[in-house]
Amino acid sequence: MTDFADLTLDELRIALAPDIAASAIFDGWNETALVAAAEMAGADVDVAKLAFPGAKPMDMIAAWIASVDAAMEAEWPAERLATLKIRERIRTLVAFRLEAVTHIDEAVRRALAVMAQPQNAARSLKLGWHSADIMWRLAGDTATDYNHYTKRAILAGIYSATLAVFVNDDSEGKADTYAFLDRRIDGVMKFEKAKAQFLGKDRELPSLTRFLGRLRYPAR
């Protein structure tokens, strides 16, 4: 059992986040859910309120997302994923995140509604980007060029779109959600393959600069 008295406020936020999400199913992301979570976990309610000043929904949602990130990293470290193909690494990580929220669909739905509000858009994008970055790093991505950014932007888009399907999916075992996820990942993999082939061909094309140089200084 967690001894909440020994936790820093940052640690307390992460520790309480899963229980807040569970309470948000019924109460929404608000102070009622925060108090219920603290009581459920056996934490001091006043300290819990100190960890989440004003019980702001986005603060609680951000802590919840961070808790899912941490659980994902603990369950699927890079070494464990290394034996899988890149497609399966990404799918495994996204699937883990979906499984982590399988029984709290309504909390996810409410969270997405809060995150979609105009005043929360920038922070929501940042949170999505951060989670996508963690997934790519666990998958072994070391890109530092423009691919670093495009990969994360695309994965964040896939994940958010999959969550939108997830909260409305009544199929057994969320089969429709996983089918949607597979189609999106397959589409990206085909695009990446085509892009790699195109860039490979591009590298084989004669250099215009080299060609002009030869015209100016013909070989002897």
Segments (PLM) and residue ranges:
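Hydrophobic alpha-helical connector segments
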Residues: 10, 14, 74-110
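C-terminal ligand-sensing/allosteric alpha-helical core of TetR-family HTH transcriptional regulators
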Residues: 71, 86-100, 127, 131-138, ...
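Short, amphipathic alpha-helix enriched in basic
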Residues: 2-46, 52-62, 66
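Amphipathic alpha-helical packing segments from all-alpha helical-bundle domains
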Residues: 119-141, 150-156, 160
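Hydrophobic/aromatic-rich alpha-helical bundle segments in the mid-to-C-terminal region
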Residues: 141-156, 160-203
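Internal, conserved structured core segments that host functional sites
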Residues: 98-131
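Acidic/His metal-coordination segments adjacent to aromatic residues that form catalytic metal sites
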Residues: 79-83, 137-142
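Long, charge-rich low-complexity segments
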Residues: 193-220
